[in-house]
Amino acid sequence: MHIEHISGETVGEVRIVSDMHERKATMAQEAGAFIALLGERYETMEELLEMITWAQLGIHKKTVGLLNVDGYYNNLLAFFDTGVEEGFIKQGACNIVVSAPSARELMEKMELYTPSHKYIASHQSWKVEPLGDYPLLNENKPQ
């Protein structure tokens, strides 16, 4: 996936990937933490929620931060609170997300972060292995 960014500037390494799943898996493997900036695309929200979900599942133990400039993420945080109040999100899972209105405050909070929620599944491996006798895709296909 290659999308031109408005600024035209590149920071760090640019890596071309085939799809969103590969993009998220690559970010999860290589990132020390995750920060959601103000996004103009659904991809920002989708990636954010997947990183929160992976933390809850125990796939990673990295900080997930929201740079909440001018209250941009207030409605999302209120949605999470409602999920807890209604019993759809466990109280401990609220600790997965760290939020602050400035980059400096967010970095300070993220540096202090330690996972305190209970995982709902055991740690998963990033490596994919064939199951039993099932052939991999395109294997043993009639020519």
UniProtKB/Swiss-Prot annotation:
GO terms for molecular function: cytokinin riboside 5'-monophosphate phosphoribohydrolase activity. It catalyses: N(6)-(dimethylallyl)adenosine 5'-phosphate + H2O = N(6)-dimethylallyladenine + D-ribose 5-phosphate; 9-ribosyl-trans-zeatin 5'-phosphate + H2O = trans-zeatin + D-ribose 5-phosphate. PANTHER family: CYTOKININ RIBOSIDE 5'-MONOPHOSPHATE PHOSPHORIBOHYDROLASE LOG8-RELATED (PTHR31223:SF11), LOG FAMILY PROTEIN YJL055W (PTHR31223). Gene3D superfamilies: 3.40.50.450. Keywords: Cytokinin biosynthesis, Hydrolase. InterPro entries: LOG_fam (IPR031100). Substrate binds at R23, K24, R41, Y42, E43, T44, M45, E46, E47, T53. The gene is LOG9. GO terms for cellular component: cytosol; nucleus. Coiled coil: none annotated. GO terms for biological process: cytokinin biosynthetic process. Cytokinin-activating enzyme working in the direct activation pathway. Phosphoribohydrolase that converts inactive cytokinin nucleotides to the biologically active free-base forms. Belongs to the LOG family. Its EC number is 3.2.2.n1. This is Putative cytokinin riboside 5'-monophosphate phosphoribohydrolase LOG9. It comes from Arabidopsis thaliana. The keyword Cell membrane does not apply. The keyword Hydrolase applies.
